Amino acid sequence: MILRKLFDYLIFIRKYNQFKRNATLTGDDYKFGRASYVSISDGSSKADVVISDHVWIYGALQSQNHGKIHLGKYTKVGVDCKLQSVESIIIDDYTTMADNVVIADNNNHPVSPSFRLYMRTTSDTDDSRRWKHSAHAPIYIGKIVGLVKMPGLTKGS
């Protein structure tokens, strides 16, 4: 029992430090699942991902090209959830996401068929594969919202 608590505490400290390195933590009392993470790339910085008080994260927060992600107070991001931003995803206070929710403010791929054809001929690290080349629009989810398992919310929602 004591070893389990110690192990859980060490996992929390490790996750807390990973999140602190890649996101702006503006409060306290966080819970991070073992598979949770923040990914910032293509010019994004920790200032682009803001996590408020009493937030539970069991999924992934992904920002590219300065895409903003803001999680309000007492928000829960369920297991295997993905928030993928190249523009802006704002989740207001007291919102809960069940497991396997995907929220993407972009199409993850270019709209133009000719650009997609070009993209398919490049390496998986090529700039053409970045979300900034896809259609994108901000997403705002208000206060006290519950998102059910496996919905997909896309740009402009």
What does each of the following model-derived ranges do?
Residues M1-V111, T122-D126, W131-I144, V148-P151, ...:
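Domain-scale signature associated with acetyltransferase and cell-envelope carbohydrate enzymes
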Residues S114:
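Unchanged
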